[in-house]
A protein has these predicted regions:
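Active-site-adjacent betaalpha module
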Residues: 1-41, 54, 58-60, 69-73, ...
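Active-/binding-site microenvironments in catalytic and ligand-binding cores
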Residues: 82
Length: 259
């Protein structure tokens, strides 16, 4: 079994014993790992070719070409599983998504709604309509885009790649393929990368060893954070509290050293 050696960083929650336990003294730590390629997978979260936030799409497209694509190509060459996780709607445009889908997921209307809270509350309708946010003027355009978007064509998926639509599918894939180390890239750092059921938090909860490729993502920023990409920085730090991170350059160099 081939392995590659990698130094990753994480965010420490406590200071060194010789310093006051103040937040100003919280810094990064490092760990050195040796990872079997056969137990490693690359998860590409929501790498869409369309997005309603034009600046995010432009920035994300550049990141995908400059940083994610070289990682994808290196993983394919090294025998590391490349897993596309592009949302349930988008995944179903690709035949690979059915490989780890259960029968009930393949049926029309397979997403059974929960019994509680009440349907009207979930939909913010009826007695709960007053709790709904005002409808955005661009809503219909966004919905049409959601129906038509695909994975960025230069990222694949190739026939040998995997495509999943849900966290349970990703978990079944990992179990079947023997994957325990998952590297994450994709968008957005403050939303889908963290919060999807195939995202960082859900897979950490399942016990997987997670590493974020921190220059292979970006957040959807806000007018109050745009000038310094503060949501991107905060999202990376947040994930580093429980997961690890590495740059695409560090990852690629580790794979090259084993070639």
């Amino acid at each position: 079994m081939s392995t590659f050696d990698l130094t990753v960083r994480y965010s420490r929650e406590l200071s060194n014993p010789d310093l006051p336990c103040h937040e100003e003294h919280f810094v990064h730590g490092e760990m050195s790992w040796s990872l079997p390629t056969e137990q490693t997978g690359l998860v590409l979260v929501d790498c869409w070719d369309q997005h309603p936030v034009e600046t995010h799409l432009q920035r994300g497209g550049q990141i995908a070409r400059d940083h994610i694509l070289p990682v994808v190509n290196a993983c394919r060459k090294a025998g590391i599983a490349v897993i596309h996780a592009p949302s349930p709607q988008t995944a179903e445009h690709y035949p690979q998504w059915t490989k780890y889908a259960h029968d009930y997921e393949l049926s029309v209307g397979h997403r059974t709604p929960p019994e509680w809270p009440p349907k009207e509350l979930r939909q913010r309708s009826g007695d709960y309509a007053s709790f709904a946010r005002p409808q955005e003027a661009r809503r219909d355009d966004v919905r049409a885009m959601q129906q038509n978007r695909r994975i960025m064509d230069f990222l694949g998926p190739k026939p040998e790649d995997f495509v999943v639509s849900t966290g349970p599918q990703l978990h079944r894939l990992c179990h079947h393929q023997g994957l325990v180390h998952l590297f994450y890239a994709g968008f957005a750092a403050n939303i889908c990368v963290q919060r999807r059921d195939y995202g960082v938090w859900a897979m950490l909860e399942r016990g997987y060893n997670i590493t974020l490729l921190r220059d292979c993502t970006t957040a959807i920023e806000h007018s109050e954070t745009w000038d310094g990409m503060w949501l991107t920085k905060a999202s990376i730090l947040d994930m580093e509290l429980r997961a690890a991170s590495v740059t695409s350059e560090g990852f690629l160099n580790a794979l090259k050293a084993t070639a």
